[in-house]
Swiss-Prot record:
GO terms for cellular component: cytosolic large ribosomal subunit. This is Large ribosomal subunit protein bL25. One of its GO terms (biological process) is translation. Belongs to the bacterial ribosomal protein bL25 family. CTC subfamily. Pfam families: Ribosomal_L25p, Ribosomal_TL5_C. Part of the 50S ribosomal subunit; part of the 5S rRNA/L5/L18/L25 subcomplex. Contacts the 5S rRNA. Binds to the 5S rRNA independently of L5 and L18. One of its GO terms (molecular function) is structural constituent of ribosome. The keyword Translocase does not apply. This is one of the proteins that binds to the 5S RNA in the ribosome where it forms part of the central protuberance. Keywords: Ribonucleoprotein, Ribosomal protein, RNA-binding, rRNA-binding.
Length: 204
C-alpha cells in the first residue's frame, strides 16, 4: 500500500493569471482541492517540494495528508500541469478522499513478461492496459497492480476476472476486460495447433 505523504500548503484568496504569476515568482505553485461534495479549496504549495514528489513513481495515486492552516485533509492528486520546457510543476488539482471507497487509476506492473512461457516460445507480449481504474478503501490504496505473467502461454489473453487485486480493492468496471495478450508470431505454433497437427499426422 502507498505510504501517506505529508505536505503543507497555504490557503489563497487571489485568483487569475496575474495572481498565479506572482505566486510562481515567490517559488510557490497554485493548486485546488475539490470533489466529494465539498466546497473547493484554493491553495498554494512550495514549488521545489511538489516538483520533487511529482517526479517520483506513482505520484498520481499517492495518498497525501495535506495540512492547510493547521487543518488536515486527506487528498489524492488528480491532474498536474507542467512547464512545457522545464517540466516544473505549475498547477495541481487534488480531490478530497471519499468517506468509504475512492475511484482511482493506478499503473499495472507485469512481472516476468520478458521470460513468460509464451515469449520463450517466440510469442510477443502485448500490453492492452497500462493503467486500470479501481475502487479502493481509502486506507488501502495501492501504488500499482502487480501481476506475475511468468506462466502465461502463447496465444492467450489475461482477463480481469483472473486478477487477484490488493485487499479492499475491486475493478471499477463490472464488465470483464483484457489486460494483456501473448501473440504468436508467424511460423510459431501454439500448443493447441501443435496437438491438432500431431493428431492429424497420426490419423494418416
Amino acid at each position: 500500500m502507498s505510504k501517506i505523504l505529508e505536505l503543507e500548503a497555504q490557503s489563497r484568496t487571489e485568483f487569475g493569471t496575474g495572481a498565479a504569476r506572482a505566486l510562481r515568482r515567490e517559488g510557490r505553485v497554485p493548486a485546488i482541492i475539490y470533489g466529494a461534495g465539498k466546497t473547493p479549496v484554493s491553495i498554494s504549495l512550495e514549488e521545489k517540494e511538489i516538483t520533487k514528489y511529482y517526479r517520483k513513481p506513482a505520484f498520481i495515486s499517492q495518498l497525501i495528508n495535506l495540512t492547510i492552516d493547521k487543518k488536515q485533509y486527506k487528498v489524492l492528486p488528480k491532474a498536474v500541469e507542467l512547464h512545457p520546457v522545464t517540466d516544473i510543476v505549475r498547477h495541481v488539482d487534488f480531490v478530497f478522499l471519499e468517506e468509504k471507497k475512492q475511484k482511482m487509476e493506478v499503473p499495472v506492473v507485469y512481472e516476468g513478461k520478458e521470460r513468460a512461457l509464451g515469449v520463450k516460445r517466440g510469442g510477443y507480449f502485448n500490453i492492452v492496459k497500462r493503467r486500470v481504474t479501481l475502487l479502493c478503501d481509502v486506507n488501502n490504496i495501492p501504488r500499482n497492480v502487480t501481476i506475475d505473467v511468468t506462466n502465461m502461454p502463447i496465444a492467450t489473453s489475461l482477463n480481469s476476472s483472473k486478477i487477484v487485486l490488493p485487499k479492499g480493492c475491486s475493478f471499477a468496471s463490472k464488465k470483464e476486460f483484457v489486460l494483456a495478450t501473448i501473440i504468436g508470431r508467424r511460423g510459431v505454433k501454439t500448443e493447441a495447433e501443435g496437438e491438432q497437427q500431431a493428431a492429424a499426422e497420426a490419423g494418416k
